[in-house]
């Protein structure tokens, strides 16, 4: 298929979406809610099928954890938005004499990564259709079949519940030109960009409004007051969840020297493997390509599989590969984002030094995303939060699942804003609120 034909495909997709959305815009709240409920039910029913497909197609992660992600994206996201008013008058602020009216955006372009393909399609479809929008997905080619499968299930569920056909569509043969044509189309109202840094920057440069997210590089401070057993349990469960593929998973441990011995003991009890200098050097060369980009061959692989790829010998049951480090910089992959079960470990001699190390890690990469602290001191937790240039500061929980709202009360989301500090337009966990325009009728109060 030539690029001209692919661009024509975009025109057809947008025309279809625009027509369907114009019809859908007239639906009542009850009709919209029935459609969204059916999407939730059908995607929940197919959570395992979609997980198997995504794992088989991409080679990333674990089927069992992808089932959990798909279930989260359908069930927890649905529960968080099911009672949200999105049609007509959505709020009456009687004291302020203001009436708020919700209206849809129109056609949304949804960029889908290969790392969390089916869960992200489910999530974006639910919040788009809850707010009476149509959505066109630009899939990562590596996960095309899985994304098509998820979108087909969702489109069928919507139509079955009374929606007009064409609210959920996918670019059938994705290319950079096709994605660019979609993002720049004058009838696209918003780009919801989850993907690599270059793609997110392209979304913001498209001429259309966009909500994009930046890369993570989550530092984890384990301070001297922490419940060490709980902290290490959280770190290992989070970093091994779907083989570390969620961008909010931990990337570097920052440990107070006074508790380092116990931290190492607890990590080894959880089958973490501490690499020597030679092993660390071997793995280091494999983490990054010569261009400085993350090597896709290690993404979403288990620790033992990474070790085999690199040529180092570790026990088969190894959960995480750990390298002790002291330098932070773009040249050092152990101080950068690694979407696989590999961690850098940095030792500090005080809480204040730990805060500074975490700040330096976020400056190096992942500014605006997420930081984690394990502590029993509320004062330390708040101090850490005040100092971190991160949109989510998580306390005593898993990075991967806490940031998306699975183990915290943050809004359940698969799109995590990084604020202007991270090149994004919001620090929020993106949800249905962000896909709705709100008009306000305001009475004079003089």
Predicted features and spans:
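N-terminal Rossmann-like NAD(P)+-binding subdomain of aldehyde/semialdehyde dehydrogenases
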Residues: 1-99, 127, 269
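ALDH superfamily catalytic-core signature
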Residues: 4-7, 122, 200-329
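Conserved C-terminal structural/oligomerization subdomain of aldehyde/semialdehyde dehydrogenase
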Residues: 25, 312-446
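Short, flexible turn/loop "capping" segments at secondary-structure junctions
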Residues: 13-15, 212-214, 243-247, 332-339, ...
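Structural signal for hydrophobic packing residues in well-ordered secondary-structure cores
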Residues: 14, 18-21, 25-28, 36-47, ...
